[in-house]
UniProtKB/Swiss-Prot annotation:
It is an enzyme of class 3 (hydrolase). Hydrolyzes xylooligosaccharides with a degree of polymerization of greater than or equal to 3, releasing xylose from the reducing end. Has low activity on birchwood xylan, oat spelt xylan and arabinoxylan. It comes from Bifidobacterium adolescentis (strain ATCC 15703 / DSM 20083 / NCTC 11814 / E194a). Disulfide bonds: none annotated. The gene is xylA. Its EC number is 3.2.1.156. This is Reducing end xylose-releasing exo-oligoxylanase. Keywords: Carbohydrate metabolism, Glycosidase, Hydrolase, Polysaccharide degradation, Xylan degradation. SUPFAM superfamilies: Six-hairpin glycosidases. GO terms for molecular function: oligosaccharide reducing-end xylanase activity. Optimum pH is 6.0. Stable between pH 4.0 and 10.0 for 120 minutes.
Length: 379
């Protein structure tokens, strides 16, 4: 059925097991995640008459590169090549832009019938697609045409790096500071887009000439995350300038809010794959400490000041912060290990979300369950 319940060739230790949960119970929870997203009455995965498939953002009633790339990663982790290929086929048919200013990027939002809602890309989709494809090639080998996974992964990254130089358009990474942009046209970032653990794989799989770039990008992102995450609270803004400070404009994305929750999870997975970074481990430990003693339903500025707004994705926030335990447990702060285990226990005791906002929350939940069970693999 699925390979995510196997224990061979995993990240290593399961934090769930370290917290005392039995392996059978862990495996059942991991299997439940697949059922909830892809099969059960609360699923948001759909197959169509073309033999392809998509996942829908149930809160916005559209199909996003974010969600499609997340679903592909989950299909890969569960060894479901059939689902992976149906999703990737839908992406290439309905999201891939063959011409125009953003040629070779993907339209970030599309209606379920394939009608584009936007002609612009969102870089978190492209970086996840590239990673999905490289890992698919490692696991299943390359096929033909769009299923020649590694070739497509290399193509995506080639345009991400070299647009504005050899190709029309703008790159998704600033060529000077090696930091990912919020969108190609902007010169600021989104801290939750920074995936140094992915860039280490890109440095092995991308075009030979670009591999040094990806090594540098991994190091640059780790430095950036240190700057973006507040030393006392561990929080980062949704949008941040290249110095890590919140990006303030009319869009009102300078608080610790929806996108921002993913940062702790990303730091945790990087620690699991590549070893802990002391400062980043301390940042996640600070985040976990703050939210064990403050109202978790409130939105905050990154300095810890409460904002008159309510968290939109409470389950996703909890799951991503719990995944950060993979880093926080390595912090030298005296309460870090205890707090990390408390977050893992809170996640274990929290069900997946139902209702219209379940899409984002349950994706973050799925990634956390895989990572904390030692089953989020990169080989």
């Amino acid at each position: 059925m699925t390979n995510a319940t196997d224990t061979n060739k995993t990240l290593g230790e399961s934090m769930f097991a370290q917290c005392g949960y039995a392996q059978d119970a862990i495996d059942k929870r991991v299997s439940q995640v697949w059922h909830e997203i892809f099969e059960g009455p609360n699923k948001f995965y759909w197959e169509n008459d073309e033999g392809l498939a998509y996942v829908m953002d149930t809160g916005n009633n559209d199909v996003r590169t974010e969600g499609m790339s997340y679903a592909m990663m989950i299909a890969l982790q569960y060894d479901r090549k059939d689902v992976f290929d149906k999703l990737w086929g839908w992406v290439m048919r309905h999201m891939y832009m063959k011409d125009g200013h953003h040629a070779h990027y993907f339209a970030w939002s599309v209606a379920p019938d394939g009608t584009p809602n936007s002609n612009g890309p969102a870089p978190d989709g492209e970086e996840y697609f590239a990673m999905d494809l490289f890992l698919a090639s490692r696991r299943w080998g390359d096929g033909e045409d769009i299923y020649e996974y590694s070739a497509w992964g290399r193509e995506i990254l080639r345009y991400c790096v070299h647009k504005g130089e050899r190709y029309d358009g703008e790159p998704m990474w600033n060529p000077d500071n090696k930091l990912i942009k919020f969108i190609p046209e902007t010169e600021w970032s989104d801290p939750s887009y920074h995936l140094p653990h992915f860039y280490e794989v890109f440095a092995e799989e991308a075009d030979e000439e670009d591999r040094p770039f990806w090594h540098e990008a991994a190091a640059a992102s780790r430095r950036y995350l240190q700057a973006a995450c507040d030393e006392r609270t561990g929080m980062n803004a949704e949008y941040a300038d290249y110095d890590g400070k919140p990006h303030v404009d009319e869009s009102n994305h300078w608080h610790f809010y929806s996108d921002a929750y993913r940062t702790a999870a990303n730091i945790g997975l990087d620690a699991a794959w590549n070893g802990p970074q002391e400062v980043l481990c301390d940042r996640v430990a600070a985040l976990q400490r703050f939210f064990l003693t403050h109202d978790r339903t409130s939105v905050y500025a990154i300095d810890g000041t409460a904002v008159d707004e309510v968290v939109l994705h409470p389950v996703g926030f909890l799951a991503a912060t719990a995944q950060g335990a993979l880093a926080a447990v390595h912090s030298a702060q005296p309460d870090a290990e205890h707090n990390a285990r408390e977050w893992v226990r809170m996640l274990w005791n929290t069900p997946m979300r139902t209702g219209t906002r379940r899409y984002y929350d349950n994706f973050l939940y799925a990634f956390a369950m895989l990572a904390l069970s030692g089953k989020y693999r990169y080989e």
